[in-house]
Swiss-Prot record:
GO terms for cellular component: extracellular region
Gene: lep
Major location category of this protein: secreted
Signal peptide positions (record): 1-17
Keyword S-adenosyl-L-methionine: no
Name of the protein in its database record: Leptin
InterPro entries for the chain: 4_helix_cytokine-like_core
Keyword terms of this UniProt record: Disulfide bond, Obesity, Secreted, Signal
Length: 160
């Protein structure tokens, strides 16, 4: 009886502890991020949207680090309407990728950079409401281009 009580009390203390997140190796982070980006690109390619030959609008300079990458992905996600085709899965995968990158940043970056506004995409709510499908398609196409650029420059994810 005494052993049972002692065991129960010791297990109670363990349940009250919170695990300390371990610093992840940046190589593992880049490998997982690469896989997640590739999955998103496959999903974007598989969906049927008008494919425009858009001139490149992003350069490697736009990948200032993980904070700016996460901010851009979150902005793309906010511009994509739930009402167009099969975008719910794409939005879920974007959220998963941004959550993973945010978690990695939180655990591995000592100094957190503040989020900045993302230039080049419509921000006004009224414009988004009036042209919701056009804004969604534009955001999907821009995100596809951005993800391809990110795939070629995964080292920028290590920059805090």
């Amino acid at each position: 009886m005494d052993y049972t009580l002692a065991l129960a009390l010791s297990l109670l203390q363990l349940s009250m502890c919170t695990p300390v997140p371990m610093m992840q190796d940046s190589g593992r982070m880049k490998t997982k991020a690469k896989w997640m980006v590739q999955q998103l690109l496959v999903r974007l390619k598989d969906n049927v949207w008008p494919h425009f030959d858009m001139p490149p609008t992003f350069s490697a300079d736009d990948l200032e680090g993980s904070a700016s990458i996460v901010a851009r992905l979150e902005n793309f996600n906010s511009l994509i309407s739930d009402n167009l085709g099969d975008v719910l899965q794409i939005k879920a995968e974007i959220s998963s990728l941004t959550g993973y990158l945010n978690n990695w940043r939180h655990n591995n970056c000592k100094e957190q950079r503040p989020r900045t506004a993302v230039p080049g995409l419509p921000q006004e709510p009224q414009r988004r409401k009036d042209f919701i499908q056009s804004v969604t398609i534009d955001a999907l196409m821009s995100m596809k281009e951005f993800l391809n650029l990110l795939l070629q420059n995964l080292d920028h994810l290590e920059i805090c």
